[in-house]
């Protein structure tokens, strides 16, 4: 549970543990109040770890140590105590005054007291017969056993340098229209992955399969992207999968995958089953992928896998993703500004829906983000407030809130570019929008459930933006 220098370790227990494991982790007994005497691992601690920690803290997952059994947990007793008392672990940044979340991973006061007493009391094992049955996890690192698996090409991650966003197209295994009930994205080396997103797209002419392509991005000494002046100044770099040879050509990329289905370390499973929902994959559609790897000082190799489960019958519902953004051309954070307000974003909902998932996405300077739902009768409800955003713990918050047609979402975010922000790599520079972590984004990812017959384009009106709040 120690915080590592690289952000991805912190990112770990976040979204997947939050978004999906709540729906798929086998039910475990609630830890009882410790009986008088010594708090033990078997009776008192293990139920807490099963409920809150083991989804990520097990072999093959992103957690830096396993917490499956006593021998692997005992050396970390004092660290566990420190992290849970400070509420750094498990990560949960939602203001408890707003919203109700079905995947709330925060510990109760009783659970914190139990873990503290265990560490302070000698971290005893206790009677092994008091332990709950171990959780049976799917093989191969999956959270849900897939019925269809797609292997992506192996990716060689260099030891150093800036890796831009890369895109690649591969063929889909779905030859006829297919409803899938879950999608899981599984890297072989999560420590190298900033994100991976993909979407299904109708085959297009001139697409080269199994070839990475990315836009050449000129950068200044601070790593900020320099804007090209004319279309003739644009260049695209390409590399065949499995090759190290990079080719350069004028023009623009041919692939533009939207972030429909994404992996970030810790968020790997998109599960539609709790909502009686599914995703319709058109027969013969290609898979267009956007990848962003990060260097760590040593070369690495990753190979992504996509796992799908199939719907047994046509679902009644589907998920629609909203990707509003406040990082417009006017977005610019001054040096040493501690409370920069991004342009306020509003989204009007035109069809009856249900709010189910929310995930604030910012980079190093992100400070806070709030979702406010205004219903047609004017009633307002803060459905999510993240007052202390941490880039290392970008959580996904799962809820169920009715959203009648005519409602409006308002998204507000602030940024801290001062030296007081411990994640800030340089408070003395202007910060503008960009893909790298030292640049910025303001994206309040939001997912709604609607009836399957609803056209996705009919769910919202065009996004609007105002001045910073």
Residue ranges and their predicted role:
Residues 91, 96-101, 131-354, 359-468:
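Beta-strand-centric surfaces of beta-sandwich/beta-rich domains
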Residues 1-5:
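N-terminal secretory signal peptides that target proteins for export/translocation
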Residues 6-7, 418:
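Long, ordered, helix-rich scaffold segments
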Residues 21-173, 182, 186, 284-290, ...:
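Aromatic- and Gly/Pro-enriched helix-to-coil junctions and flexible linker segments
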Residues 13-16, 46, 97, 106, ...:
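Short linear sequence elements within intrinsically disordered, low-complexity coil regions
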Residues 8, 28, 34, 199, ...:
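Alpha-helical and His/Cys-centered functional microenvironments
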Residues 9-22:
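Bacterial N-terminal signal peptides
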